Design a protein with these regions (language model features):
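Short, surface-exposed "cap/lid" segments of acyl-processing enzymes
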Residues: 1-24, 28
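Active-site-adjacent alpha-helix of alpha/beta-hydrolase-fold enzymes
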Residues: 10-20, 184-279, 286
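Conserved alpha/beta-hydrolase
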Residues: 33-46
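Gly/Ser-rich "nucleophile elbow"/oxyanion-hole loop immediately N-terminal to the catalytic nucleophile
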Residues: 54-68, 72-100, 115-120
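Glycine-rich nucleophile elbow surrounding the catalytic serine of serine-hydrolase chemistry
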Residues: 98-108
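The feature captures the conserved acid-bearing segment of alpha/beta-hydrolase catalytic domains
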Residues: 127-234
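Catalytic active-site module of serine/aspartate enzymes centered on a nucleophile-bearing elbow/loop
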Residues: 286-353
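C-terminal outer-membrane/trafficking sorting elements
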Residues: 360-441
Length: 441
């Protein structure tokens, strides 16, 4: 995170590799059994450049350099894998998870792979229309893999930098056209009120510099297109399921419909694979953040040699967006993010043991629940194997009924005594879980 500038200089009390949220996310991944690498990248751009095209070029170069550095990091781990595998990684399951600016890096990493994509008209200097000049010159800055250019130190040449999924926290992409069929699966969490990373599509602006670049797409529009291209088809069983995080995301998406995001666009119908974090704060962007004002002033004055007021200003700017910032709030949003991301990572990388969408569809079609709609009882039948566990969840994710230690192909649940509404019935068969909707009336 950090808007591609160093902490304090970016106007924020965050932007370090050891920020609370960043470290907590890495620790949470590690506790789940993942190898977590907290990767830094080159920073710096010029928001005070005189023209909008120069500001856009400066910011996009910063994103571009960060993508190059991240690809170099992936190649580093693949190189190590071939030479002892110090960290015990699985090269068939590499996930890029980015927070704030890191979300931009993750989405750009997965989508930028053609020269034409960085030579769109908005990335050209058109001061002389007869002689357009590319603002991102690969002869100077190198290609998107970090090879060539004047400033790159090429590393781990020959190793793949392929990844298998992208998770974004409040990120966006430079242009929606970058996203194409065949790109890796992706999911996101995002505040519709984010004033920098627009939730739908809009301009990126900084108060002191005005518009930086135009038509940047945030998580809502990115996931809408990724879903429509079929890139996220592998996640369909998760979205059809009844885990509490998916249900919470679906409820939040329904609540977000009709909202106006910071760019002035009215949010449309709910979209799978994005969890909108809607709070009571009108400019909320990073509800997972947590910082200490005293430490912020110390970093500004002692570490960076700036006036103490710079640290105070950074704290006040951030607290204006997140006035109820607290450990409880930060941890709650980190938990929601991890719960939402990890379920999708497991599915996208086949950690759940399902070999294909066809296999999952076959298992799902083998389960019958009737009558549906129901009243006081339902029968669950299986054609594929013995039912081990049945769980029923309300639309808010509350577990309302469980039957465990089962061993039958047909189970009757009676005396439900449930309120009218939509419920999710999760059936476990030989360690595999399928969720179906049940209506109680």
């Amino acid at each position: 995170t950090g808007t591609f500038a160093p902490i304090i200089y970016n106007g924020n009390p965050t932007g370090l590799r050891d920020d609370y949220a960043t470290a907590a996310m890495c620790q949470s991944y590690a506790k789940r059994g993942y190898v977590a690498a907290n990767v830094e990248y080159r920073l710096g751009w010029n928001p005070a450049a005189q023209t909008q095209s120069e500001r856009a070029a400066s910011l996009m170069k910063a994103v571009y350099r960060a993508i190059q550095d991240t690809k170099s990091a992936v190649r580093f781990f693949r190189n190590d894998y071939e030479n002892g595998n110090t960290w015990g990684i699985d090269t068939s399951r590499i996930i890029l998870s980015g927070q704030g600016s890191g979300g931009w890096v993750a989405l750009g990493y997965a989508t930028v792979d053609k020269l034409a994509e960085i030579q769109l008209s908005k990335f050209l200097d058109l001061s002389d229309p007869a002689n357009p000049v590319a603002l991102i010159d690969t002869a100077e800055i190198g290609d998107w893999d970090g090879y060539g250019g004047l400033y790159n130190v090429e590393s781990n040449i020959g190793f793949s930098n392929d990844i298998h999924m992208v998770c974004s926290m409040g990120g966006g992409i430079g242009d929606l056209s970058w996203l194409e069929a065949g790109d890796v699966p992706m999911c996101a969490v995002h505040c519709p009120t984010d004033p920098v990373a627009i939730y739908t599509t809009g301009d990126v602006a900084v108060a002191a510099a005005g518009v930086i670049t135009t038509d940047i797409s945030g998580s809502y529009d990115v996931m809408t297109k990724a879903n429509s291209l079929g890139n996220n088809d592998v996640l369909d069983p998760v979205n059809a399921g009844g885990d509490s995080y998916t249900l919470a995301a679906q409820a939040a998406s329904a609540n977000a419909q009709g909202m106006t995001d910071y760019g002035g666009t009215v949010v449309g119908a709910p979209v799978d694979n994005v969890f909108p974090f809607v709070t009571q704060n009108p400019f909320e962007a990073s509800p997972w953040d947590l910082w200490d004002s005293t430490t912020t002033v110390y970093i500004a004055s002692v570490v960076l040699g700036l006036p103490a007021q710079a640290g105070i200003d950074a704290h006040m700017s951030a607290i204006a967006q997140n006035p109820d910032m607290s450990p409880m709030k930060a941890n709650a949003y980190i938990d929601s993010t991890m719960g939402y991301f990890c379920r999708r990572i497991v599915r996208a990388t086949n950690l759940d043991g399902q070999n294909s969408i066809d296999e999952m569809s076959q298992l799902e079609s083998s389960i019958d629940i009737y009558p549906n709609p129901a009243s006081q009882s339902i029968t669950i039948g299986s054609k594929e194997g013995l039912i081990n566990t049945i769980e029923m969840y309300s639309a808010t994710g509350e577990l309302v009924r469980i039957a465990s230690n089962l061993s039958s192909t047909k189970i009757l649940l009676s005396n439900l005594n449930l309120k009218e509404g939509l419920y999710m019935c999760t059936v476990e068969i030989n360690g595999q879980r399928v969720t179906k909707r049940v209506v109680i009336q």
